[in-house]
Amino acid sequence: MSDFDKLTPKQIVEELDKYIVGQSKAKKAVAIAIRNRIRRQKLSEEWKKEITPKNILMIGPTGVGKTEIARRLAQLSGSPFLKIEATRFTEVGYVGKNVDSMIRELVEIAVNMVKQQKMKEVEEKAKLNVEERILDALVPMKKKTQIPFANIFGMQMEKPQQTDDYSENLRKREELRRRLRSGELDNEEIEIEIETSNSPIGFIGLPEMEDIGMDLSNVIGNIFPKQKKRRKMKISEAKKVLLPIEEEKLIDMDETIQTALELAQNRGIIFIDEMDKIAAKTGSSGQDVSRQGVQRDLLPIVEGTTITTKYGPVKTDYILFIAAGAFHVSKPSDLIPELQGRFPIRVELEPLKEEDFVRILVEPENALTKQYQALLYTENVQLEFTDDGIKELARVSYKLNQKLENIGARRLYTVLEKVLEDVLFEAPEIEEKIIVDADYVTKKLKGIIEDEDLTSYIL
């Protein structure tokens, strides 16, 4: 059991609070959903089959934290996570992505996740193998050779000269190994052999092939043998190039794929954004009919079905689906009834207030102000935000959201980037300490805020 699996829903919310301000209802809903997954794993096989995830529908304007809540939750739980827009899909039979492709993408993410974990486990062993390959390039290993006549009678007589050569070779290698580990040889150039694909033609993936879980480029690539090429490079670069190659040799890909399939099926999270854009009102025609078609294609996946992928069949019964949308024009009730029923948990996220902007700039562990401070610290520039400076940034951002289109917390990015533009450009050729107070913010934004046309383009 991982450390995350021991967390209670309350503790999961506390973890999310470190990165996301407010939205306690949404945090509570996702924490319960994830905890129920952990509870399900402890049940007997008979009960496991009966209990499926309760999918969530998040309703709220852009920039209030819908995606971030789902993304952070996936990171905390170590779950494969895929964010997609519902609008990228088309009904089966039309040109465009079919809804099945989301499952294939999730599995691909899971395979890469497990592969990275396995590669990390064998990293030390792989580093030793890389070391040997580099030493082979510097001083080819000499083998002990036996006298042919002695071989006939099973005798192990060695030529004295060859024994001396072998010992000298070993001594040289050990000396170079010491220098290699200390980094003395990093700038030396060596020639190494690297395997490359020998496929004579480049292939573009066809949607038809993707739909049946086939990757044509992989099929063709497996037909043609891999070609070995010799490349010259510095030892420092060779270490980076050879490490993933040696790591891959040490991991069992069949086991990796099997683990990844289990992970995707039982712990996968798919975040479907812009769900409101595929909602269609009753009696509509044309484009709205196509939207309904996407909903009907989505239904069996959310209900639970088996999708064929290039790694094997994947059951979607236990994947957690989190859908989100602003629902300004349409309503959740405009979705087809069957799909509505598959998202039983509905959470409304609150629009951000001015005080929320203040908290967003200060409280999260990855707060924007802290990000800029860290960036400029690399140039020996100390950036300090005063309380009135933070409040002014929040006030301006909130006001712009009211005046222009409401893009939520994303407004802080544009405002802060504009305020710090000169500092970021001139660093490190400026004074070592920059204080961002209310006057500083006003001075940097004055001309833009006063000109409404300019505001709409720049902020």
From Swiss-Prot:
One of its GO terms (biological process) is proteolysis involved in protein catabolic process. The keyword Repeat does not apply. It holds the Pfam family AAA_2. ATP binds at residues 21, 63-68, 273, 338, 410. Gene3D superfamilies: 1.10.8.60, P-loop containing nucleotide triphosphate hydrolases (3.40.50.300). Keywords: ATP-binding, Chaperone, Cytoplasm, Nucleotide-binding, Stress response. It comes from the Bacteria. It is found in: Cytoplasm. One of its GO terms (molecular function) is ATP hydrolysis activity. GO terms for cellular component: HslUV protease complex. CDD domains: RecA-like_HslU. Its main location: cytoplasm. The keyword Nucleotide-binding applies. A double ring-shaped homohexamer of HslV is capped on each side by a ring-shaped HslU homohexamer. The assembly of the HslU/HslV complex is dependent on binding of ATP. ATPase subunit of a proteasome-like degradation complex; this subunit has chaperone activity. The binding of ATP and its subsequent hydrolysis by HslU are essential for unfolding of protein substrates subsequently hydrolyzed by HslV. HslU recognizes the N-terminal part of its protein substrates and unfolds these before they are guided to HslV for hydrolysis. Belongs to the ClpX chaperone family. HslU subfamily. This is ATP-dependent protease ATPase subunit HslU. It comes from Thermosipho africanus (strain TCF52B).
